[in-house]
């Protein structure tokens, strides 16, 4: 897994000393940098504070998919899927070097709980929500085509469906969005620890530590985009916001030594019917993910032995002759609304609580998907507009090209 960094080029270290910003963003994951870009493109002055490195947390430890979320249709999250498919189409257009369309294969066996009729219905709705574009079409493979599917177990194979979604390098995408934000005037302090924020009716006072130096600034609004640290950041804000009832859900991925030729695989875990992906990752492949509640320090999350065993059991079930040599593994944390139900069945809708709906000075991003970062950022800026000065928009993030940072 590529490590994150705050200093890809010398320009990343250039910081204009400014005492006041329209928006201060806390957190340098994909949602934080997305807000920085959206705000800067809307003409606002922005400061982003990141405690360690860009994409150091969840934004470098995801499944690295830009997708509509086919399985969310089972929970009737049609709005979320439609938005995600819209965002997928936008990212394929504005970031072709970062986001690439890939074929996905869904195998069906007698023990598969999602039967062919159900899959056809779901994929049909998926195609409709995607606008019936080329990247939204699906088909059932002929029996002869299944022999070329990277050693997929042929015995009792009843059907294989092919559809399309997209893949990215999440850390690279995060860096590209931040670079775009900087080009439109956003400022980055990294590493910089957020210390406190005093939220008042007329604005905010923010303190942070950069190296050994404590600094402060004022802003019209503060955005808490700290991901798994969202409540930790909230505890440093005055007046103290209500603690957000969330669960941290650990997801582990394995990087395997053997690559894939045909594409990506969407498999149903025989143990619990959860969705598991086997994805090409350079010359290797990536297998994931798990979902287990996590209660420790977010920075200390690490793959568990039982998670490795669980994933390799899935691999063995579908690909009995593939190598199971693990050359790397990583774990990340998703932020989900607290609930008694299994993490797999919970909504992925992003929540944007504010301190004052009439004149918001503080907004938190709770949850969120990699695919929807741009749409979420647009909602954040729209929500905060009534608390911000009038500015002239400079660019539209829906059409602004994104390039890899070299």
Map each language-model feature to its residues.
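Helix-loop-beta segment of a Rossmann-like dinucleotide-binding subdomain
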Residues: 107, 147-184, 205, 290-299, ...
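Dinucleotide-binding Rossmann-like beta1-alpha1 core, especially the glycine-rich loop
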Residues: 64-148
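Flavin (primarily FAD) binding-site architecture
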Residues: 224-239
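Core beta-strand elements of the Rossmann-like FAD/NAD(P) dinucleotide-binding domain
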Residues: 19-21, 212-221
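Beta1/beta-strand and adjacent pyrophosphate-binding region of the FAD-binding site
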Residues: 17-31
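A conserved short coil-to-beta-strand element within the FAD-binding core of flavoproteins
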Residues: 190-204
């Amino acid at each position: 897994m590529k490590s994150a960094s705050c200093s890809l080029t010398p320009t990343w270290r250039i910081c204009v000393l400014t005492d006041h910003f329209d928006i201060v963003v806390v957190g340098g994951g994909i949602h934080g940098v997305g807000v920085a870009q959206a705000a800067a493109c809307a003409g606002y002055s922005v400061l982003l504070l990141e405690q360690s490195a860009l994409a150091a947390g969840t934004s470098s430890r995801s499944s690295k998919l830009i997708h509509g979320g086919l399985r969310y249709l089972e929970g009737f999250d049609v709005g979320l899927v439609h938005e995600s498919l819209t965002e997928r189409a936008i990212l394929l257009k504005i970031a072709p070097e970062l986001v690439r369309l890939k074929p996905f294969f869904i195998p069906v066996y007698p023990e598969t709980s999602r039967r062919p009729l159900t899959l056809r219905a779901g994929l049909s709705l998926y195609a409709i929500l995607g606008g019936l574009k080329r990247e939204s079409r699906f088909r059932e493979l002929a029996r002869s085509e299944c022999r070329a599917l990277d050693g997929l177990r042929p015995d009792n194979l009843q059907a294989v469906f092919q559809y399309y979604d997209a893949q990215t390098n999440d850390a690279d995408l995060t860096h590209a969005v931040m670079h775009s934000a900087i080009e439109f005037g956003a400022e980055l302090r990294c590493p910089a620890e957020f210390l406190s924020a005093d939220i008042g009716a007329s604005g905010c006072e923010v303190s942070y530590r950069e190296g050994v130096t404590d600094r402060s600034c004022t802003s019209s609004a503060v955005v808490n985009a700290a991901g798994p640290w969202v409540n930790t950041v909230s505890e440093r804000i005055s007046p103290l916001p209500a603690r957000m009832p969330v669960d941290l859900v650990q997801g582990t991925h394995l990087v395997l030594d053997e690559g894939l030729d045909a594409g990506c695989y969407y498999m149903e875990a025989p143990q619990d019917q959860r969705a598991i992906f086997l994805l090409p990752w350079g010359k290797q492949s990536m297998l994931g993910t798990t979902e287990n509640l996590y209660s420790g320090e977010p920075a200390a999350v690490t793959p568990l032995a039982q998670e490795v065993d669980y994933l390799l059991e899935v691999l063995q079930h579908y690909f009995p002759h593939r190598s199971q040599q693990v050359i790397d593994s990583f774990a990340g944390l998703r932020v989900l609304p607290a609930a008694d139900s299994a993490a797999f069945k919970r909504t992925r809708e992003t929540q944007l609580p504010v301190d004052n709906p009439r004149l918001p000075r503080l907004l938190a991003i709770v949850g969120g998907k990699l695919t929807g970062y741009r749409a979420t950022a647009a909602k954040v800026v729209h929500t905060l507009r009534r608390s911000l000065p009038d500015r002239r928009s400079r660019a539209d993030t829906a059409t602004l090209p994104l390039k890899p940072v070299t």
